[in-house]
């Protein structure tokens, strides 16, 4: 069952105590978009943070072959991770054609078992982008297959355009980390990030901030098991 928004949980005690955090996104720039501010805050609290990319964004640059785009977007992601001070891991799915099958379940399960996180953040499962949905399903099933050995949280990417029906129950004030988040996000030069920040992030992060009495915030829902 998903946690219902019966009450706002704007405090951040829930962030404390995590030692190893994976942020698993479908494409280069998704982890940064979802929660780079929270990644930075978790690092400041002493956690090791890893950005995991399900695909390498092979279909994400008009006029480039998949191989060319993969090289460019992996380099951009590594640069962003350097800004954030986190490690980058690339899985082997293909942008625009992410799959849910036995082999892909095994790949995600192997990642979880190798990294041994106590916290994982990934896409909210209701999303207009197929790769985002696939990523969420694979992470959720890995959580189940590994005995729910980590806390699982969902976050949002371009809500309204991509993420749908997302009602957060947890917030993180990222005001002190937002400049660094934007610096990391801007490393994805091939994605025309300036426009995305102006059209989406400024509005969304201010709105989430209003929900928890902060200037800028990121929002989450925890996956619960009963």
Where would I find each of the regions flagged by the language model?
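Active-site rim/loop-helix segments in enzyme catalytic domains that contact anionic ligands
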Residues: 6-115, 144-145
